[in-house]
């Protein structure tokens, strides 16, 4: 083989790769769609992965510049950004069969071929099967059973807060709330029997998933997908990256529970005790997810088998652990901050708690009566949407949405920040913390305008558990304390993050109160 031939082949391969990346980078230019161009190969991915400036806020800035519909490229992905509520509703709900995939980084694996796929990443009939099985965990009956465990963790947190604030110190409530949510979800997703608050080593592993900087790794994986798959395969064997380290821990937890169940011949009570038991009850060695990938998702009345592979059991527990940790802690942190800087609103919440509970026990049935607290939580999530970067979809079949043609393979990213701060949708007081805007029972005029938990069939499955956790803890906290700002309180909050939008800290003073 001559040197000239080798050089010619090498040059042809290089030219082919270069042409491919230039085709992606110029995609929106050729379509006549406005948007930030970024750089060849990378697009705007490096900007979106900056920890110090959340991608959510960058989208808001670009929407002001380019309008409510524009396009960008991030690595090998072509992304259409949408900040129009009618289009959001069309994509998430009316045309769900054309947009049932989700925007993923290649390091998360191929959702159609990968064995280790959880509900967030799954698509098609595999997603439907996982969703059907998982939804049992969040029924009203299941939540009622969970209430006792959630409240036990809430009371344990109050004991730690009492110790830490005995001298009048201000504390970072974000850290305390993370301990609380990990304690709750650790009991449900890891089979933890007792509280491990402030002594659970897994907390730091999970914090690192959300707070650690993995910009270069994520960038390389998304720009060069084959490298992402290679790194994924390698890190499952040698888990060093926090997410894979946590997955490895979860594998050990599930294996231990399987061994326990085999010794005890099943769960003692004959019914699921936690998420692990629920998923293990559905475990089967005969799950064929490759067949699901071949099915036409638009088909109706196709039988959904309620079975999980062993890897899917681990994946579901892993997802529920990370999903239940960060977002609920962040929501509680934002509510606390907003109540501290708005004492009159805080007093209304306290009055409602006194009216509904007084000095009596916090009953599950009465949590639904905390209507004003509902409004406060909703408004906090409007002002500070959390994991809204997850409000994305993959176009599975070329279609037209409100006159905009979207080709198969294009990703759609909803600009939640712009939707939540649009004065045309919310009024000129859009930047104000105004819980009363939620006091009416009438549905929102614009159905795609509010996306704290997503929308449509892929809406966050753990939403009701998250709200219950917040209501129980806030009720106990505000029975005993008043949130006040101090010299360590950042006003306004400094927001950071990429996967989720987090405050750097939420220091407040908790003044004891007599009920």
Curated annotation (Swiss-Prot):
Top EC category: oxidoreductase
Keyword Chloroplast: no
Keyword terms: Heme, Iron, Metal-binding, Monooxygenase, Oxidoreductase
Membership in a protein family: Belongs to the cytochrome P450 family.
Classification via Pfam families: p450
Name of encoding gene: cyp-13A2
Protein name according to UniProt: Putative cytochrome P450 CYP13A2
Highest taxon in the source lineage: Eukaryota
Alphabetical list of Gene3D superfamilies matching this protein: Cytochrome P450 (1.10.630.10)
Annotated residues for binding of heme: 460
Organism listed in the record: Caenorhabditis elegans
GO molecular function: heme binding; iron ion binding; monooxygenase activity; oxidoreductase activity, acting on paired donors, with incorporation or reduction of molecular oxygen
InterPro entries, alphabetized: Cyt_P450, Cyt_P450_CS, Cyt_P450_E_grp-I, Cyt_P450_sf, Cytochrome_P450_3A
EC number of the protein: 1.14.-.-
